[in-house]
């Protein structure tokens, strides 16, 4: 099959397949990828928790570094991916290659800068992310290999998102799942069999992500994608580079504020000792796993929304958003029910310390209620980002961990003490829900009007 044939087949798949079947086919591998990624994050928490409470706290500190890596990768991946998908929807394959190449090589450059700066200032960097003096040696040992692999990790996120936006979620899944499973297998080998401790967890993450990078790059080099990577295709137009940054701004805001929010959470929790930092870290990792389901369904929506918006099939964009809302809510209800009935056992699985459990358990229960609001937040943000409404998408992306969370984490612990630390995230989620809902409802009505206008201008069928 020629490149042109693949492009035509992909166009018909994305614009004609019934919405429920299309989204589920794209969401299933994405959800699996997200779950595996979350599981290997939980595996790090589990194995590092076997060392000490201070080592367990290091996971929370380094998670803020991971959020920075994700912020850069998702900014370039989502930013180029939404443009690529819309260009493919309008059948412009040359532009797709141009934007793909630009984002990939930019990701490598950003990763090198992060690695150099991070390694040169490592102890101060870890303290800035919320480490205590007792956590610091573990955090530095854990972060060092991850920083070395940062260029490949950021580039992998770009490739993964481009594959998804092309509608090739199965190929994206192969790279991420392989890396995730390898990470889970390598953790105990490096940490305990080789006696490397927390440094072993970092080495396992870096090595598995390097292999994931190689697998994803192979997909592009072997012509399994419509867009391709060519250094000669990197855009020379500042306007196009700014389009990538604007399209990725919601992801950068979301992930960047996740890093800042995590840092502030660690700083607020460390006033109550290493057990508080470890407890909040465990809760955050568990809910990253739960939220990965909603985000996975939302990522199944993104290429569908982008492709069909570019093809001016607005009714399909609306149907896709509504179906995603329903599917994400049902899946979250099931997950929360299971976790609620096993809450204490779940927390003790990662660190069997009464002090850690005393902090984590109330925070976990508060979060269980708030997480059911996430489908509206996720669908609103991802829909706007996918159709190129960068301003609205960026604002909503900044609400959860920025506009709502940061004022709360600065005020509530001073007023309510440790309870304030535990309540910040669920209250921020509730506020973000009430902000996102009217934006989403208004846009769904707008899509309906745009579809009617498009139908009225369509040529009569003979």
Name these PLM-found stretches.
Residues 1-27, 84-151, 193-249, 305-370, ...:
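Short alpha-helical transmembrane segments in multi-pass integral membrane proteins
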Residues 16, 20-39, 43, 65-72, ...:
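Residue-level signal for short hydrophobic patches within transmembrane helices
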Residues 25-44, 145, 179, 208-212, ...:
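Transmembrane helical elements of multi-pass membrane transporters/channels
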Residues 30, 34, 46, 63, ...:
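Transmembrane alpha-helix boundary and packing residues in multipass membrane permease domains
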Residues 35, 39-57, 126-133, 189-196, ...:
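Helix-terminus/linker motif at the lipid-water interface of multi-pass membrane proteins
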Residues 56-116, 153-172, 279-343, 374-396:
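Small-residue-rich hydrophobic transmembrane alpha-helices
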Residues 68-71, 183-188, 213-217, 289-292, ...:
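Hydrophobic transmembrane alpha-helices of multi-pass small-molecule transporters
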Residues 77, 146-164, 172-180, 201-216, ...:
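Short runs within selected transmembrane alpha-helices of multi-pass transporters and secretion channels
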